Structure formats: C-alpha cells, structure tokens
C-alpha cells in the first residue's frame, strides 16, 4: 500500500492536489491522509515522498504574499478575512504533520509554543464561556471577541495533534499548566456542546462551519451506535500527553477498552462498533484490509498496547503520578 501511495504523489508534493482532509467520514486523496498513512507504515523524513510533501508544507509556515492555497485557492480570492483564516489553518495543519514526520528545530518549537500560548489565551478569555452567538436557525456564529489576529484559536484536533507530538512540552511546568487548562476546557460542557462543529466562520463570501472539534460521547453511545474508531484516534492523541487519567469520563472509556482484552492478551473489538469505511478506521488499519480476523486482531492489539504504553509513560511526566491508575 505504501508504494502505491508513493506512485500517486504529484509533482507539487500533494495527493490529488489537496492538502487537507476535508471529509472526516472517508479517506480521500490528499496530502494529510497520505502522510498519516505513510507514518503508519513506518516511513519517515528520510523517504522521498515525505521529503516532497514536507517541502510543500514548509511554505505554509512562511509569510509569502503569493502563497499557494491549493484547494482553498478559489475560496480566498477577493476575501481578505478568509485568506487570513486559511493562512493560519494551513499553518496549523502543516506544523502538525511536519512535527509528526520528525522535523523539529528551534523555529518549529517556537511555533508550537506560540500556538499553545494563543490556545491557552483563548481559554483564559471570558468569551470562552460563550464563544458563539445565535443568528437564527443555522449554526451559531463564532463571536468577534473569540478571534485573534484573524483566527479563532478554539482547541481542535489539529492544534491537539501539534501538542500531542511535542512531548518536550512535558518538560516545562508552564507548558504543562497550559495544556491542562486547554484540555479541561475541551472536556467542559461548554465545549462539548459545540463540538464537533465549533460554530460558523462568517466572511465576505458567506459562512462555513469551523469544524474539527473533539467530541467525547458517553460510553453507551459508542456501544450502541459505533464510531469507536473516532474515539480510538482521539485517545491516540490524548495518550501522547498522558492526560487520559485526569478525567473520569475518559478513564471509564479506557477501562472498558482494557476489559475487552481476550484471555490470550489480544484485542478484537466487534466490527459493529467501528465504522468500517470511515477515514478513522482507515487510519487505524495498518494491514491492507480487515477481511482476515487475524489482521484485524493484530492491528487492534498493536493500537491498544500503544495507547497503554504512551499513557503510562507520559502520565508520569504530565501529572507527576508514579502510581499505575489502571492494570496492564
């Protein structure tokens, strides 16, 4: 599968001429999805397709006036506010992918700290208690006070990805304090009521949903409706920061996942709990498909062991907790 992906990469470093995974429900050709898949296969910054993609992603970290917006090119034309918004958005998407690929230097560290400061600043702002306003029967609109320098830094999956793959943040007390503050807000009723849409962005060309909020549902919802694949992807990020055992709701989910381990030490979650054709399931899957029960079991066991390993190692640093909060 990795070699097939490599062959489909375009000369501009993208797949399909797109950067961002717009549809969260299915795996479409784009730079973001392709890189995440390659990372799963063990490809890193030393490989040719990752290098080509990184070259494109680095352009979003600059202040170039003639920046190429790819799939957003038409959207930003003659719309200054939308251009500022997508400059920030693509910068955030790009930084997360570059860090995940192993591109870490002083410049990227400063960019991570800046985004953490801006996100924590939003959470500290009184507007965070009511970041949207009703404008009729449609989605609520993000309030002007929630914006800063052309972007609403409401925590979302892309900001969380940046923090999750920056474990060096756990070496600083100020950074840890800000991370806890951000995730306390994510787990709050105010945020959860807004997620995953997070409100409307209004510009000269109309409005669009910001999206990408982290929605954590009750365990009964996943058991009844499925979508456990989405929860596992979110847990993959949260475990990188060792924050799962800070929240009773997340720990109840985590303990239930642990209870699904078979007597032989493996996991094979029921297919009905996973959205078989979803983007999230595709990103969880390392094998080419799950037609074989053995392939699915191997993938799920690997994912679960990784969750437990990351959570245990990182919680010691994040929460200064030496005791194991759950049995392994």
Residues of each region from the PLM?
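Preference for long, amphipathic alpha-helical scaffolds in soluble/luminal domains
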Residues: 1-328
